[in-house]
Regions:
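An alpha-helical repeat/solenoid feature that recognizes helix-turn-helix modules
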Residues: 1-16, 36-62, 78-110, 114, ...
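Intrinsically disordered, low-complexity N-terminal regions enriched in serine/proline/glycine
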Residues: 12, 17-21, 28, 119, ...
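Internal amphipathic alpha-helical repeat/solenoid segments
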Residues: 20-39, 72-77
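Residue-level signal for alpha-helical context at structural boundaries
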Residues: 22, 66-68, 214
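Short linear, low-complexity motifs centered on an aromatic residue
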Residues: 59-73
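Contiguous hydrophobic segments
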Residues: 69-81, 171
């Protein structure tokens, strides 16, 4: 899967044969479905594959003749599944600093822009306490830190982003367990810890030394 590809590629693992096999599987899948839209509704599938392909240096604009970026041009489709959609679309677009394709002139859909994705994420911030969640009024560590990863490139240039990110990360610090662990959906897990470390790293914060995220040392 794409997360395995991303993790290994970012680590620097070198296995051209394995990466080529992954790429060929993606090409085969895209050509079999005959579409650059990898799921009928969930465009996070496109975003995830774009991230994976970019990690191995492949071109997501030409995968067996299909441009996987094109479906992300429709903001209405991107946000259909909720906040996950724009979070991962923004991450995917920024992994390769990709230009967002233009919608056809006769399209009635909303054109995706980076500004539109950012604003959608900001608008979904939990009022008062800060952070983000799929639903409810309490910040979820996974969704919050994923949102922060998407917004991090704009932290120093957009005051609204900076303020929202700061509120979100404070909410995460407040939820951190006494042993330093993190949990989501009532379960302490390594994935929530990893997402938090990724978010902190994107902000230039050392999770191993920053007093806001080091507990009982």
């Amino acid at each position: 899967g794409e997360w395995a590809v991303l993790g290994l590629a970012r680590y620097g693992y070198e296995d051209p044969e394995w990466y080529t096999a992954y790429y060929n599987n993606v090409v085969k899948y895209v050509q079999n479905i005959g579409s650059n839209k990898l799921h009928s509704r969930k465009l996070t599938d496109n975003s995830r594959v774009i991230i994976g392909l970019t990690a191995i240096g492949a071109d997501p604009t030409n995968v067996g003749g299909y441009n996987l970026l094109e479906p992300l041009a429709n903001l209405d489709d991107v946000v259909w599944q909720g906040i996950n959609g724009p979070i991962y679309a923004l991450i995917a677009l920024d992994t390769g600093d990709y230009e967002i394709p233009e919608l056809p002139d006769d399209s009635t859909a909303t054109q995706t822009t980076r500004e539109g994705l950012i604003q959608y994420i900001l608008d979904k911030e939990i009022p008062g306490s800060g952070g983000w969640a799929l639903w409810g009024t309490k910040a979820d560590p996974d969704i919050t830190t994923m949102a922060v990863q998407a917004l991090a490139p704009y932290y120093n240039t957009n005051a609204d982003v900076k303020a929202a990110v700061n509120r979100g990360m404070k909410a995460i610090s407040d939820q951190q367990l006494s042993n330093g662990g993190m949990g989501s959906w009532g379960t302490v897990n390594s994935e929530s810890c990893a997402q938090t470390v990724c978010a902190l790293s994107d902000l230039g914060i050392d999770a191993d030394t920053d007093p806001q995220y080091v507990k009982n040392m």
